[in-house]
C-alpha cells in the first residue's frame, strides 16, 4: 500500500482480461458497499485502484473485492480483503489533521534553565504552547474551548541577547524517543539539541499529556488528543517582529495519522 495525499491507503491491482469488459467493487458478505474500502476500475489500462481509510478500531475488518466480467458464461471473481486492527494507541483522531485550519495563532513559552548563572546544563529547553482563541492557560491547566499544541524543543544553550530576550534558533527539530537517564546518579542529565521528545502518557491526571501532544478542549475538558511520535518541526523567526515565529509541522501520531500545517 502507499499513502495518498487525502489520507487514504491505496493498492494497485493489475487485471488481464481477454475478450470481455469487466467491473469491480468492494462489498461486505451481503453485497453491500463497504464504507472503508473503494474499488475504482480502470478497464482500459487494466488495473484496479483499491483505496482504504485507516482502521482506527481495535478489531480487524474484512470484505470482498468483486471483479465481474460482462461476457456470458464467465463467473465473477471474489477476492477476500482484510484490514488489520489498529495497534494499541492513545490518539483519538480517526484521520489526518490539517493544523492550518484550526486557527492556531498565538502562544507562550518558558525557557529552562532561565537563570543566566545556571551554567551546568549545556542545552536550553523551550516549553512551548500554541493556542487558538478561546483557550487560555490558568493555574489549574487550560480553560475554555479550542485547540492547543504543546511541545518542548531543545537547542544549544541560549543566552540573553542585547535586548534582554531569548531567541529560538531557526532550523529543523526532530521528534525523538526521550534519552534514558544515565546510570551514574551523579551524572548530569540533558537532552540532545535540535530534538523534541515525543508525546507519552503521564501517570497522573494532572500530568496525563507529557511532551508533544495535540489537544482539543471543550468547556475546560480535553475532548480530543493525539500524541506526536515522529516527524519534524521547522522554525523560522519572522523578520521585523520582536518575538514572532513561523512553525511548520510535519508530524505523525501513534497510529500514523498525519498532523501537518504552518
Where are these regions (language model features)?
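Surface-exposed helix/loop patches within compact recognition domains
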Residues: 112-235
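Short, exposed coil/turn segments at beta-strand boundaries within extracellular/luminal domains
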Residues: 69-78, 257-259
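A short beta-strand micro-motif common to beta-rich folds, especially ectodomain repeats
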Residues: 59-71
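Beta-sheet-dominated interaction scaffolds and their linkers
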Residues: 1-13
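Interdomain boundary/hinge segments at the C-termini of tandem beta-sandwich modules
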Residues: 80-87
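Extracellular/surface recognition and adhesion modules
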Residues: 13-15, 37, 65, 81, ...
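Short, surface-exposed loop/turn segments at beta-strand-coil junctions that are enriched for proline
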Residues: 53-59
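Surface-exposed binding patches on compact interaction domains or structured appendages
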Residues: 10-49
